[in-house]
């Protein structure tokens, strides 16, 4: 995925300003930055949920606007911050939605097998008949990830997947993100506020400030106290844990 000179305005105000970057295939790339930096807007544009005002997003050598929705949904899955489905659904029924681009709602035995596999991968077999609105936040997020796995796309876009989760469930969610890449071969792009999760679980980090890219590179290249101080306007210290540069800020 190649983004060039991407621009987005709201009410005349530029919120994404001529942004260009390329997403490394088969890796985890985290978008970080302060509130209002443009991270989620960029995510919305590259997933085609938000219309752009300028620039291009090339996906498999074709601008993303030219893809038919059904074909794009076989290659790219998006999980937004808010996933409030206004229906009484069980976990299995939710995960079944992941097969819609392929089956159109008429699942084959192969579709059902893929659904079974996705539910098992997220260890939801024992509660697959429970309703989504009866689950804990962590269980619900795992159910949505199972739906994404059932969609069987090469690219997975996650907008703040740890939002509203406690430390235990948030860290488990990040382990799942890592597994999507390492075990299932996905290219994962996610928006994160917790920079230490980005540092520990990502391969690359793209840091935004005021609608522009401040720094893009490997975790080691981005996670310096000088870079982070420029991005967040607070003081940082960097320490290494398990070979990863993690930050202390105050």
For each of these PLM feature ranges, what is it?
Residues 47:
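Helix-to-loop junction immediately C-terminal to a conserved catalytic motif
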Residues 55-63, 72:
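Conserved ABC transporter NBD signature motif
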Residues 131-135, 139:
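Conserved ABC ATPase signature
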Residues 156-160:
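Catalytic Walker B motif of ABC-type/P-loop ATPase nucleotide-binding domains
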């Amino acid at each position: 995925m190649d983004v060039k000179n991407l621009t987005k305005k709201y009410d005349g105000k530029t919120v994404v300003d001529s942004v260009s970057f390329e997403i490394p295939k088969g890796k985890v790339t985290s978008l970080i930055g302060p509130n209002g930096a443009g991270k989620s807007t960029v995510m919305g544009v590259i997933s085609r949920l938000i219309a752009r005002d300028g620039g291009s997003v090339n996906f498999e050598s074709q601008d993303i606007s030219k893809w038919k929705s059904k074909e794009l949904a076989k290659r790219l899955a998006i999980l937004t911050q808010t996933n409030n489905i206004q229906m009484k659904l069980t976990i299995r029924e939710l995960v079944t939605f992941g097969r819609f681009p392929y089956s159109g709602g008429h699942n084959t035995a192969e579709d059902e097998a893929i659904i079974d596999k996705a539910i098992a991968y997220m260890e939801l077999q024992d509660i697959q008949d429970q309703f989504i609105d009866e689950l804990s936040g962590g269980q619900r997020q795992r159910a949505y990830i199972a739906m994404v796995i059932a969609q069987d796309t090469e690219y997975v876009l996650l907008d703040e997947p740890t939002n509203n989760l406690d430390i235990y469930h948030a860290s488990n969610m990040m382990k799942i993100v890592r597994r999507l890449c390492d075990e299932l071969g996905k290219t994962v792009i996610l928006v994160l506020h917790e920079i230490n999760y980005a540092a520990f679980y990502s391969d690359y980090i793209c840091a935004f400030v005021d609608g522009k890219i401040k720094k893009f590179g490997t975790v080691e290249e981005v996670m310096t106290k000088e870079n982070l101080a420029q991005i967040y306007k607070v003081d940082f210290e960097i320490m290494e844990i398990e070979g990863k540069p993690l930050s202390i800020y105050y």
